[in-house]
């Protein structure tokens, strides 16, 4: 049974997270110490440098030869079931929206956005920071290595899946947009960052409005490439005529351009998303860490100290700055629960009920029992990982839900996990 001192260890792990979030909230809400552009820059640093280094460190120090096969299989099955179920719902919702017409389609956000959000909330827990001290008090030191194995699978597979879906949505938007006309007949390279995007737009309350695509590089080139490849696949003569008008200096009205824009080919959209994924540091960090782990634990050597200390300096900023960024995000909203209480309650149900229940059934299917089964279910009831908010804010997709899930989830997770611990022990 978990003791009072072990509960205090969990509180010790929680307190620094809220300290960073409170500091970020107060710095923006009351002290006005950071502008919207600077807040976007902080989050961009975390996504571009701190998190990839943390990923590399976690993956490279995990002994892949001693991973628990049944736990990994149950974790993979849980996430696969959730993702496939959400994708099936998204396809059904998309077909229903098509039948309802363009107005109904415009009134509802993309189902794929909700797939990413619900999947992240349900299946990507804060395993290391919250899970290790909590499960250590419940099940002993054996839980620490098991938690690390789940984190490694998240970083190597599931976060890359999430990023691919983000990039897929961005590629579809870019491909569906008409190619920009140029008086010289050539596309322009216009790199943009979250800092520039935040500086370029503001809402009626003076808050920064997030751009649809924070990491776009040479988007105009990609749009033109997509249009050209679609034309090669057999686009109607209207597109060719429109291209001739642009090259001769005639610019059609925006409505006509949008109406005549060809539907992007699925294979080209996927190819553009894959190319973007291969340019992201997280992809390199996870697979380089995996390669290092395979070699190092096979040959029995360790990381040079100078490299290890350099990585330590960067990776220690990841969690603190992630929580700080979450606090600055909430401070820039008009209310403390940005997504609203109904959506917040819905996300808590997904996090603390749907995720653990699916994990329970997945574990039983794999044949797990005893302490291993209990650890698998309880870790699924841990709060949302801070990294999920970082990517949601970076790609500007339901960051309000993610920030609420992180902040409220840490408060709720302790009593919820204790309830699961008691129920599983009956």
UniProtKB/Swiss-Prot annotation:
Its membrane topology:
Multi-pass membrane protein
* Transmembrane regions: 7-27, 39-59, 71-91, 115-135, 146-166, 287-307, 311-331, 348-368, 372-392, 406-426
Any idea which GO molecular function terms this record carries? Answer: auxin efflux transmembrane transporter activity; identical protein binding; protein homodimerization activity
Question: Topological domains (Cytoplasmic): residue ranges?
Answer: 28-38, 92-114, 167-286, 332-347, 393-405
The record places the following residue ranges in the Extracellular compartment, namely 1-6, 60-70, 136-145, 308-310, 369-371
Which tissue types show expression of this protein?
A: Expressed in roots, leaves and shoot apex. Expressed in roots, stem bases, stems, leaves and young panicles.
Residue ranges for the region (Disordered) are 232-258
The subcellular localization recorded is:
Membrane
Where does the protein principally reside? membrane
Quote the subunit structure annotation: Homodimer.
Q: What is this protein called?
A: Probable auxin efflux carrier component 9
Source organism of this protein record: Oryza sativa subsp. japonica
Q: By which gene is this protein encoded? A: PIN9
């Amino acid at each position: 049974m978990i003791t009072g001192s072990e509960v205090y260890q969990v509180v010790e792990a929680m307190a620094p997270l809220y300290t960073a979030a409170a500091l970020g909230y107060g710095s923006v809400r009351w002290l006005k110490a950071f502008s919207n552009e600077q807040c976007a820059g902080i989050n961009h640093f975390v996504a571009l440098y701190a998190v990839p280094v943390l990923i590399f460190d976690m993956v490279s120090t995990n002994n892949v030869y001693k991973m628990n096969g049944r736990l990994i299989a149950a974790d993979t099955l849980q996430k696969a079931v959730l993702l496939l179920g959400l994708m099936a719902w998204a396809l059904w919702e998309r077909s229903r929206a098509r039948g309802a017409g363009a107005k109904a389609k415009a009134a509802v956000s993309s189902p794929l956005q909700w797939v990413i959000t619900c999947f992240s909330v349900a299946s990507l827990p804060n395993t290391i920071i919250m899970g290790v001290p909590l499960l250590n008090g419940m099940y002993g030191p054996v839980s620490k290595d098991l938690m690390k194995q789940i984190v490694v699978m998240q970083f190597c597979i599931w976060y890359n899946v999430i990023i691919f879906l983000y990039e897929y949505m961005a590629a579809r938007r870019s491909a569906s947009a008409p190619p920009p006309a140029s008086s010289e007949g050539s596309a322009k390279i216009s790199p943009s960052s979250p800092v520039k995007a935040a500086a370029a737009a503001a809402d009626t309350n003076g808050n920064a409005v997030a751009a649809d695509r924070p990491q776009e590089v040479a988007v105009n080139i990609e749009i033109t490439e997509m249009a050209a490849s679609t034309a090669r696949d057999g686009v109607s003569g209207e597109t060719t005529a429109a291209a001739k008008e642009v090259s001769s200096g005639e610019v059609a009205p925006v409505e006509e351009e949008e109406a005549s824009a060809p539907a992007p080919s699925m294979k080209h959209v996927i190819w553009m998303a894959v190319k973007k994924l291969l340019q992201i540091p997280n992809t390199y960090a996870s697979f380089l860490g995996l390669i290092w782990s395979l070699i190092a634990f096979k040959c029995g050597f360790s990381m040079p100290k100078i490299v290890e200390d350099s990585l330590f300096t960067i990776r220690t900023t990841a969690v603190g700055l992630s929580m700080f960024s979450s606090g600055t995000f909430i401070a820039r909203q008009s209310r403390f629960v940005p997504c609203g209480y109904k959506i917040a309650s819905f996300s808590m149900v997904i996090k603390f009920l749907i995720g653990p229940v699916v994990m329970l059934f997945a574990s039983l299917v794999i044949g797990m029992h005893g302490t291993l089964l209990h650890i698998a279910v309880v870790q699924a009831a841990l709060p949302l990982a801070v990294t999920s908010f970082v990517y949601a804010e970076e790609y500007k997709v339901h960051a309000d839900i993610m920030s609420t899930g992180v902040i409220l989830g840490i408060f709720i997770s302790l009593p919820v996990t204790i309830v699961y611990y008691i129920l599983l022990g009956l």
